[in-house]
Swiss-Prot record:
Domain of life: Bacteria
Species for this entry: Burkholderia ambifaria (strain ATCC BAA-244 / DSM 16087 / CCUG 44356 / LMG 19182 / AMMD) (Burkholderia cepacia (strain AMMD))
Family that this chain belongs to: Belongs to the LptD family.
Keywords linked to the UniProt accession: Cell outer membrane, Membrane, Signal
Subunit comment: Component of the lipopolysaccharide transport and assembly complex. Interacts with LptE and LptA.
GO cellular component, one term: transporter complex
Protein's recorded name: LPS-assembly protein LptD
UniProt signal peptide: 1-39
Function, as annotated: Together with LptE, is involved in the assembly of lipopolysaccharide (LPS) at the surface of the outer membrane.
Subcellular location: Cell outer membrane
HAMAP family registered for this protein in UniProt: LPS_assembly_LptD (MF_01411)
Example GO biological process: lipopolysaccharide transport
InterPro entries membership: LipoPS_assembly_LptD, LptD, LptD_C
Length: 786
């Protein structure tokens, strides 16, 4: 007896008009009753909707996932031009056949579905969609709900991650795992001829773990093989995954050709390790390991590299960098900052290979400390040591230091506090004074603030006690134990006026803010005190309203002076943005300052200080400007100036122009500065960007540092090239040496990327630089819903 056809009244036979007809085969449960409804609505949309026919489906306002109840089986839906089969057993469909069950969809010219085994056999233009992954090929055989089976000659696409490729065969293990034989993979979104792809004898994909593995993989770029490995792992979505990272290339005038082959270990979501062998043509093979870790209570980075038997230096070279932050709770914390190199010439020889070292660095800090912060209390206990490379002069180390601060605000209108500090100073320089110092600095201030004024009188004391265990031969008669007590009284007051003005067709609020700051500190002889941590303060708008002209606790300048300043601002009343600011200030002396940094310096003898003038503008269309001048009226000389202009009308469009001038740099190297600086990032075409920096010393007629690069941004790859001339080391006379390097960086979007220093150089050299966009954001699994 022939099998009874399904729905004989719905499909009258081959003689019916050839229009698309629907066979709704509900094979999941007996009686043709659906196991679960997949369109669950809310609100007005959840109300019963009138249907045009018994076989119409109600439309849902959005695509949603609704899990089945425990033990329930999803219904099976079949759409085709022609169907036949046995009720509750099997179904054959021909002509634009489509089978849906749960999340799985099978489309083909013809298919056969067995209800008992949940097995679907599809032939001709087959498409299988499950969990956001689609496969297309001539033939497929699979268990629909379990998504287990195989397809021949498939083309595949991961809708969520954007990856795609083809193979001779794919074996589907479940809804997340699949194995491809003799296939390809790419994250390029182009349908044909991808810019880069991986070709391998076998691919194992796990979309749940977001990981792909290629056996005998070869990475092609523009049809050219650029890398091969018997085992390649890579992320499917561009997220962090263990595996090889793209190699990087550079050419350095000191080291020759450099090639890096980094391997990334994604140990845990909060820990990773990168091992980077670096081939340096002139020196050998350097190995670097960088470990990063993060937790709710601590974080840090530990990086170390080692170059055995440097062929140029004829010795082993290494560098170590460790930065750690710890939160113990209850206001207690700790930290470690450790930076060390193997020898004096390491920075200039190998500094370009380290992101935490530059070629001119001569001081390396090695410090560990404990902190406490709770309310008004702040405590620091630390041990600090310095590694000093010539020609720098070694600073004093604190071995150890204990610093305690207490600060209270607005207690009956008073602000008061104190700082207590104990330090034991040690130094590696021979014949230098060493010893202990205790400092206690209390203060009290009373501030009166109103809508348009403020008045703040303040009294503070400086107490210091020295216990020196070794005296320099230059000061053999100085006492080893002595104390200092120095009071300071200051009075700070100002007014704030404002008015509405209209300039250039725009409304502004203009302020006028005069300010007077008076400070008195009596003279105390401090020539016996060594210079443990003290230097001359810079002189500018940030320092002109400070009581002491020195930084540190070994010198307190005597003072009887008043500072007069005037500030005017122009504020946009709609947004509150400050569009312009102009400042002028000067100090006037009632007595000469007698305290100097050392006995060689002459006391300050003048009626007033240099004049300080500054201006800042922030106009429309991305234009900004900051300018500052220090002018000596007695000598009619410009002592210091800084002029800067910035223009950034859009993303990745920025131009900076600056000029720096210093007649005499007494706090650094006593050398004048007369430099012109220009930097920019600008698009040349829709995809090509130019990046550059040029810093020229007008006094020495030489390039201090320069950078010129190009970046090309394609849909699924980016290429950057750059040439950089940079300061690298300091000679015995204190002048900077220079080196040149060439860098090239290829980024394969959707695979992985690593910076070989090119992007870091662009970002450091061009204020406002914006990196090229990464791969487009992943799509939803419903983006290409079928």
């Amino acid at each position: 007896m022939p099998p009874k056809p399904l729905f004989p009244n719905v499909f009258p036979g081959d003689g019916a008009p050839r229009k698309r007809r629907l066979a709704l085969a509900l094979l999941a449960v007996p009686g043709l009753v659906p196991a679960v409804s997949y369109a669950q609505l809310s609100g007005a949309a959840a109300q019963p909707q009138p249907l045009d026919s018994p076989w119409d489906l109600r439309l849902a306002p959005q695509l949603e996932d609704h899990p089945l109840k425990d033990g329930a089986k999803p219904a099976a839906f079949v759409i085709a031009d022609h169907t036949s089969g046995t009720a509750e057993q099997d179904l054959a469909a021909k002509g634009s056949a489509e089978l849906r069950r749960g999340d799985a969809v099978v489309k083909a010219d013809a298919l056969h579905y067995d209800q008992d085994t949940d097995m679907a056999d599809a032939y001709g233009q087959v498409r299988v969609i499950n969990g956001g992954t689609s496969f297309a090929g001539p033939e497929a055989h699979l268990k629909v709900e379990a998504n287990q089976g195989f397809m021949t000659a498939p083309k595949y696409h991961f809708n969520v991650t954007g990856g795609s490729g083809s193979a001779e065969r794919v074996d589907l293990l479940d809804s997340e795992r699949s194995v491809f034989v003799n296939g390809t993979y790419t994250a390029c979104q182009c349908a044909t001829d991808p810019a880069w792809y991986i070709k391998g004898s076998r691919f194992d994909f796990d979309t749940g773990a977001d990981e792909g593995t290629a056996r005998n993989g070869v990475l092609f770029f523009q049809g050219v093989p650029i890398f091969a490995s018997p085992w390649l792992t890579f992320p499917l979505s561009g997220e962090r995954r263990s595996g090889l990272l793209p190699p990087t290339f550079s050419l350095n005038s000191n080291n020759g050709f450099e090639l890096t082959l980094p391997y990334y270990f994604n140990i845990a979501p909060n820990r990773d390790l990168t091992i980077t062998p670096r081939i340096i043509s002139r020196r050998g093979v350097q190995t670097e390991a960088s470990f990063r870790y993060l937790s709710p209570t601590y974080s840090g980075t530990l990086t170390a590299n080692y170059l055995p038997d440097d062929r140029l230096a004829h010795r082993n070279r290494y560098a170590i960098y460790w930065q750690h932050q710890q939160n113990f709770g209850g206001g207690f914390g700790g930290y470690v900052y450790f930076n060390k190199v193997s020898d004096n010439t390491y920075p200039e020889d190998l500094g370009s290979t380290n992101e935490f070292i530059n070629g001119t660095q001569t001081l390396y800090q090695q410090e560990a400390g404990l902190t406490y912060n709770n309310g008004p209390w702040s405590v620091l206990a630390r041990y600090q040591h310095w590694q000093t490379l010539p020609p720098s002069i070694a600073p004093y180390s604190r071995e150890p230091q204990l610093n305690v601060k207490y600060t209270k605000y607005n207690v009956g209108g008073f602000d008061f506090g104190a700082e207590a500090d104990y330090s034991r100073f040690r130094i590696t320089t021979a014949d230098a004074t060493e010893g202990d110092r205790i400092v206690f600095n209390p203060y009290i201030a009373y501030g009166v603030y109103g809508p348009g004024y403020f008045v703040v009188p303040k009294v503070q004391y400086h107490f210091a006690s020295y216990d020196l265990n070794y005296l320099s031969s230059s000061t053999p008669n100085s006492p080893k134990r002595f104390t200092e007590s120095i009071p300071t009284v200051s009075f700070d007051t100002g007014l704030i006026f404002d008015r509405s003005v209209r300039l250039f067709g725009q409304d502004f609020i203009q302020t006028l803010e005069p300010r007077l700051y008076y400070v008195y500190t009596p003279y105390r002889d401090q020539s016996n005190a060594p210079l443990f941590d003290t230097a001359e303060s810079d002189f500018g708008l940030a320092e002109i309203y400070q009581p002491n002209t020195f930084v540190g606790n070994d010198r307190i300048a005597d003072a009887n002076r008043i500072t007069a300043g005037l500030t005017s601002r122009f504020i946009d009343p709609r947004t509150g943005d400050e569009r312009a600011r102009f400042v002028i200030a000067q100090q006037y002396y009632f007595a000469n300052q007698r305290v100097t940094l050392n006995s060689v310096q002459a006391p300050v003898q003048a009626r007033h200080s240099d004049l300080i003038v500054g201006a800042a503008l922030k106009l429309g269309s991305g234009f900004m400007s900051e300018t500052a001048f220090q002018y000596n009226q007695n000598n009619n000389q410009l002592v210091k100036s800084s002029i800067g202009f910035g223009f950034s009308p859009g993303e990745r469009r920025v131009i900076n122009v600056g000029y720096r001038y210093t007649r005499a740099n007494t706090t650094l190297d006593n050398q004048p500065i007369n430099q012109f600086l220009v930097s920019a990032q600008w698009p040349l075409t829709r995809r090509l960007y130019a990046v550059g920096r040029f810093n020229y010393d007008l006094a020495a007629n030489r390039v201090v540092d320069g950078l010129l690069g190009l970046q090309y941004d394609a849909d699924c790859w980016a290429l950057g090239v750059g040439a950089q001339r940079f300061a690298n080391g300091v000679n015995s006379s204190g002048q900077q040496n220079s080196s040149t390097r060439f860098m090239m960086q290829l980024t394969l979007k959707g695979l992985s990327s690593i910076d070989n220093g090119l992007v870091a150089a662009f970002r450091a050299g061009v204020p406002g630089y914006t990196a090229l966009p990464s791969a487009p954001p992943p799509m939803s699994r419903f983006s290409n819903y079928e």
